[in-house]
Amino acid sequence: DAHLNIVETLLAGEPEAEVLVGIDEAGARRSWTRGELRSDVASVAAHMHRAGVEPGDRVAAWAPNVPEVVIWALAALSIGAVVSTASPDFAPAGVIDRFGQITPRLLLVGSTYTYGGQQFDMRGSIDDVLAGLPDVIGVVVIGEASDPRHHSWSSWVADLPPLECVRVGFDHPGFILFSSGTTGA
């Protein structure tokens, strides 16, 4: 009857070691040391907990492939929540089709994403998605949050609480992954 938390294992070790690197389409590089990552994960996890997220609750990310999504996922896993993601190029109906099945409590959204050198603004679609996800109690926006009801990512990584991981059973789910049908499975 083992109980563990994968985040404890992933974030254990030398705090100065570089463990997360993000490179955007233009080649700009951002990186986190284990200590920086641990701090950001702890801060986001504390905000999730304060928002009412409990072990087994679902949180979702409708965002590009950026380091903030990794931090979001690690924070959720650290408190026993289950993570799901959707590509930013999904229209609101596609996001609702997927996330409506899992009733997420929190939603992480990228304010913009870049594809093929072109920037797309997602902020105008957030309310459309929320209209179909009535169980969402909070929205966190990577980048500029244009709606005062939404939290900015920078405000969610501003705290420095210690990381406290919830140990869960070995069979506790961590992710819910959706296929677009292109996997052949």
Name each model feature, range by range:
Residues 11-13, 37, 41-44, 48, ...:
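Adenylate-forming
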Residues 7-33, 145-149:
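AMP-dependent adenylate-forming
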Residues 16-18, 141, 151-178, 185:
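Conserved pre-ATP/AMP-binding loop-to-beta segment of ANL
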Residues 1-21, 39-44, 58, 68:
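AMP-binding/adenylate-forming domain of the ANL superfamily
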Residues 75-154:
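Structural core segment of the AMP-binding/adenylate-forming
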Residues 47-96:
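Conserved AMP-binding/adenylate-forming
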Residues 59, 76, 173, 179-182:
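Conserved S/T- and glycine-rich ATP-binding loop of Class I adenylate-forming
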